[in-house]
């Protein structure tokens, strides 16, 4: 299970890559943040021919959350999290909702934020199949807060199966480069609201 529904403004439409004769595009979707927080910037990938939208359009889409790991010459990995979509319109609109299942492949410890809120991070290994039958392994970073974080810390361990429902969130962080320059990057995670 890997189902995402989103509503937002499409921005920064451009070329991503090509495989064979198929061109893939990329864009950002600006989604209204929950609870009055800043907007979330969700990365999108899609087959270029499937995009019928223009810069700044308000759109509603469904798709699935994927991860892509890129290895560099210095043996460092960069994992990119994005939503792949065919621009199908969801039958039931949720402005930002994701359903996922899989096995926990990395589990953090229960922590307390500087604001006194309990939280825990874990990585979910999620497998999906493309329409062509290709199996994709995705590794999705997840965060849980408050009482829910305590429950998951007590009940679950690495390799355990879990189903979750939540939102996709983004945050900007600074990356210090070898030449002492600073690069601003966007990281994505699933904030878990329900589980079973």
Where are these regions (language model features)?
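Single-stranded nucleic acid-binding surfaces, predominantly the OB-fold ssDNA-binding core
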Residues: 1-196
